[in-house]
């Protein structure tokens, strides 16, 4: 049996609590990301990993030591680190003559590599190089994607999904206006991906809605798409499957229209309208001739019954 897949039995209560936190849940924990340096990572790649780690804090793990591994040839080391640090997202940085300033971004499913996309860094401006105010740690970003490629090409579609997964942060029910502090903007244009980070400034506008200004915060990256390792459609659908307990229960006889209005259908027994009490108006009073005919009908019914 592989060392990654063997069953670990806890020996202490602390170890038991630790393993219970990692067990599958209906509502999973926030996805953590691990940032790993390759055996030949240069200064540029190291700075990129540090800046991405600064954006991901506190939901990231930065490995400071170099790790000699090649993700597209052997993924066992990545899967080992994923299980060790309980991270389902990763970014691997390396540098060589064939692929200079290389980044590999990917995600795991059940501690096995699901999707993996290789990106080349063509231009980089660090957080420290842009002398503007920064956002506090743990701020949830707004993600903006511009460019038709993100909706047309399959590789770019998966890259968009992967970037959303990587930078989305915790899921929250409500967001206050002052909490919208910074934007991550991704633009796909002419075979390149431009990654920009802006701080959101709310200015006075003379009305209730504030005036919005964007101030570049960093980091800034110009990327180019290289190799891809994408999951099959069946495995991708399996990873997106929702547990039955989380699926909303269907309510009978209730429907909704496009505007969100709720309609309900009520099932009732057939009502005898002849016994319905109406307003006693002079015009609705029965005439003597009508009363005589009704009395005759009632008498005939009694005779038939007898």
UniProtKB/Swiss-Prot annotation:
Disordered: annotated segments: 270-306
A GO molecular-function descriptor? rRNA binding
Record keyword Signal present? no
Q: Which UniProt keywords apply?
A: Nucleus, Ribosome biogenesis
Q: What spans are recorded as compositionally biased (Basic residues)?
A: 277-286
Domain of life here?
A: Eukaryota
* Any Pfam family: Brix
Q: In what ranges is there compositional bias, type Basic and acidic residues?
A: 287-298
Residue span, Brix domain: 31-234
Q: Supply the PROSITE patterns for this chain.
A: BRIX
Describe the protein's quaternary organization and the partners it interacts with: Component of a hexameric 5S RNP precursor complex, composed of 5S RNA, RRS1, RPF2/BXDC1, RPL5, RPL11 and HEATR3; this complex acts as a precursor for ribosome assembly.
Tell me which family the UniProt entry assigns to this protein: Belongs to the RPF2 family.
What exactly does this protein do?
Involved in ribosomal large subunit assembly. May regulate the localization of the 5S RNP/5S ribonucleoprotein particle to the nucleolus.
Name-wise, this protein is: Ribosome production factor 2 homolog
The scientific name of the source species is Homo sapiens
Give the classification, highest ranks. Answer: Eukaryota, Metazoa, Chordata, Craniata, Vertebrata
